[in-house]
Structures are given as C-alpha cells and as structure tokens.
Amino acid sequence: MGQVARPPEDSVRQWDLPESDRRALLRWGLPHDAHMRPLFQEGAAPVLVPNLAGERERQVASPGERLYTLVHWGEEALQLRIGTVAGTGRVLKIQPKPTTVDDFHPDLRESNAGFYDPSVEFFSSSVVQFVETSWRCHVALGIAFELWQDPPEPDRPWEEREAWFSRLQACERIILEQVERIDSHVRADDTDTLWSTVVTELTHAGN
C-alpha cells in the first residue's frame, strides 16, 4: 500500500518548525498511497495561505499564519492540501473555499440543508504526531482493507455479513484509539475528525 516519500532536506532544514518536527520529516518521511500523496514544497517560505472564511476557520487558524505544504489529499479537482503552520508545527487541512450546500446539485440541496465543510480544519497537533499517525494508519489500514475486500458471499446467511461488518468496525475503532493515543486532541469517538475520515475512507473505498 504505497512507498515512503521524503521531503527535500535543504528546504526542510530552513523551515520555521520545531526541530523535532523537522527531524521526523527527514527521518521517516510520509507514506504515499492513493488518497494521501506527499507533496512537499520547495524553498524556505511557507506557501499555503488559509482562507479564514468564517468563524469555524478562525477557531483553527489565525490571520497571518502560513503553512508549508506536506500532502495532496484526495482528487486533484478538490485542491485539498495538508500543511504545517510555520512557527508552531500544527498540521491543518486547507482548501480554497468552504464547501456549502450551494455546491450541491439542486436536487440534493434540500436534503443537505446547512451543510458546511470549512476551508481550514485541524489534523494533528504537530508534525511529529502527524508523521507517526500517518505511518501507523498506513500499516493498520492495509490489514483492515484486506478484510473489507473479503466479505461473505452474497448467498451466505445475513449473520455472517453482519459479523464481517462488525469486525471491520472493530478494526476502525482500534485504529482510531491508537490515533488518540498519539494525539489526545484527536478523539477516537469523534466522527468529525479528519483522521476518522481517513480511516473510514480507506477501509470503505468503493462503497
């Protein structure tokens, strides 16, 4: 499920990040898979500018903050980037603008009234924690994905499929509990965290 990708050393050594964050990136790099693809920026100056479109974004980032690009997440058309804030090392998801109900097809707007996906969201408390979580999820999700690819045959009793689905949910729960162990700001029981999205996105790929 992917290979290691490391950032350009000359650039990272100039980044305004805690030394432990720079060391983690240079030593371990990040996994490369179909959903989260490392996209390390060149140069010493952070290039990501968060769009503080509303209150939810301003709870996560502050005016004037800039981020170093680490990862391209999801489809290119979505322009989702994961970056680390210069000075603090916090890791955030950045997109050009919030996604609102106005972005849905007209037939879907009523059923999604009030939908709001902010342009800035918290991912991890530090690069160190993001790197460790990324690698541990990368390995664990490989096992969970194998389980997802091996469901009971359609003609088997419903109880077997229910048991299979329960095992898959248990795998996800274990993974998210380990994420919380690494970073206490990412609650295992909070389905709105981005790590929860990563876990369920990979194990339910194609559903």
Question: Where do the language-model regions lie?
Answer:
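A surface-exposed partner-binding patch
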Residues: 1-87, 96-99, 173-207
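Charged, low-complexity surface segments at secondary-structure and domain boundaries
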Residues: 5-12, 111-118, 149-151, 181
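Generic detection of intrinsically disordered/low-complexity segments and helix-coil linkers/edges
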Residues: 9, 22, 62, 124, ...
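Alpha-helix boundary/N-cap detector
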Residues: 16, 118, 122-125, 159, ...
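Surface-exposed intrinsically disordered loops and tails
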Residues: 49-55, 105-114, 156, 162, ...
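Compact, glycine/acidic-enriched structural inserts
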Residues: 89-147
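An amphipathic alpha-helical core segment
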Residues: 135-179
